[in-house]
Amino acid sequence: MINKSNLIGLTCISFLSYALTGALITITGIFLENISKYFNIPITDMGNTFTFLNAGILSSIFISSWITNIINLKTQLIFGFILTIIATLILIFSHNLTYFSISMFMLGIISGITMSIGTYIITNLYTDQTRASMLLLTDSFFSMSGIIFPIITALIISNNMKWYWVYFIIGIIYLIIFLITINTKFPIIYTEISKKRIKTWNFSILCLSISALLYILGQLSFISWMPEYTMKYIHISINQSSKLVSAFWMAYMVGMWIFSFILKFFDLKKTIITLSGISLFLMSLFNIFYDYALLYIIILSLGFFSSAIYTIIITLASQQTPLSSPKTINYILTSGTVGTLLTFIITGPIVQKYGIFSALLVSNILYGIVFFLVIIFATLTKTKPIHD
C-alpha cells in the first residue's frame, strides 16, 4: 500500500509532466519570427524545424511501453532530467540549426515519455471512481502551461532577451520533477497484457481517429500561426498577441473542468456535434474580424467550447467495442499526436505560398471537416451507455 506522501509526490509528477509538454508546444507561435531571424532563415522554414519536436513526441508513444519494460519509471525520469540539461545547453551555446533540430527532437522524446509516465502513474494509482477526474485534472496542467508560458515568452522577447531563456525556464519544470522523483518511492506497477483482440476496428473508430487527427491539426495550426497573423495584419504588439494565446488556453482549461461535471447529463453524440459546430462558427468569426477586444472575446469562447471535443472523441471511441480497450484509446491518442506532428509540415508550405492568413483558413476548413465527420459518425453508429 502506497503511503500518502508518495501518492502526493507521484501525483505532482503526473501534473508537471503534462505542464512540461504543454509549455514546449504552446510557445512556438509566440517567438517564431524572432527565432527565424536568429538563424537567418524564412519563418516557414523555422516552422518546419519545430516538426522535430512533434516527431520526438510521436516517437515517444511507440518507445515508451518498450522502455518501461526495461527501465523503471524513477530511472527514466532521472535520465530524462540529464537529457533535458544537455538539450538546453545545446540550445543556449550552439548557434547551429542542425543542433537546434536535434535538441527539439530530444525535448520531444523526453516530454513525450515523461507525459506517458504521468498518465501511467495516474491510471495505476487511482481507482475507477477517481481516475477520470484525476486524468482530467492532470490534462488541465497542459492548458495551464498554455496560459503561463506564452506570457513569459512574450516578456522575454519584448525585453530583448534571447529566445533560448524560455527553454531554460521550461527546464525548471523538469528540475522540480527530478527533485520530487529522488525523494519519492515508486511502486512496482505490473501491466496486464490483454490477449483479447479488438475485432471492431470498424468505420466508427476510423471516423473518430480521423476526427482526432484533423481536430488537433486544426487547433495547433490555428494557435501556432494566429500570433504572427494578429501582429502583422491586425497590428497588435507581441504582448497582446500572447494574451490571445493565453486566453485560449485559459478558457480551454476552464471548459475542461466544467464539461467534466456536465457531460454525464447529455448525449455525447449530440454534444460533440453542437460543440464542433459552435467551434467552427467561432473560428470563422475570428478570421473575419479585426477588432482586438472582439477577437479576445471570440478566442475565449473558442477555447471554452472546443475544450471537450477531443475528450469526447476518446470517450466515444472507447464505447465502440464490447469492452473498453486501451488499444482503442491509444489508437485515437496516436492519431491526435500525428495531427501535432503534421502541424508545420502541412501549414509551412501553405504559408510560404499563400501567406499567414491561409493557415487560419486551413484550420477553419479542418474544423469544418471534423463537424461533418462527427455528424456522419452520429448518424451511422450506436453508442453504449456510460457506466460509472
UniProtKB/Swiss-Prot annotation:
Compartmental location: Cell membrane
Entry's InterPro entries? MFS (IPR011701), MFS_dom (IPR020846), MFS_trans_sf (IPR036259), MFS_TsgA (IPR023528), MFS_TsgA-like (IPR050375)
What membrane topology term does the record carry?
Multi-pass membrane protein
Keywords, alphabetical: Cell membrane, Membrane, Transmembrane, Transmembrane helix
Enumerate the GO terms in the molecular function aspect.
Answer: transmembrane transporter activity
Q: What is one cellular component GO term in this UniProt entry?
A: plasma membrane
- According to the record, the segments passing through the membrane are 12-32, 51-71, 77-97, 102-122, 137-157, 163-183, 203-223, 246-266, 272-292, 294-314, 331-351, 356-376
Q: Does the keyword Ligase apply?
A: no
Give the protein family.
Belongs to the major facilitator superfamily. TsgA family.
Q: What is this protein called?
A: Protein TsgA homolog
Q: Which organism is it from?
A: Buchnera aphidicola subsp. Baizongia pistaciae (strain Bp)
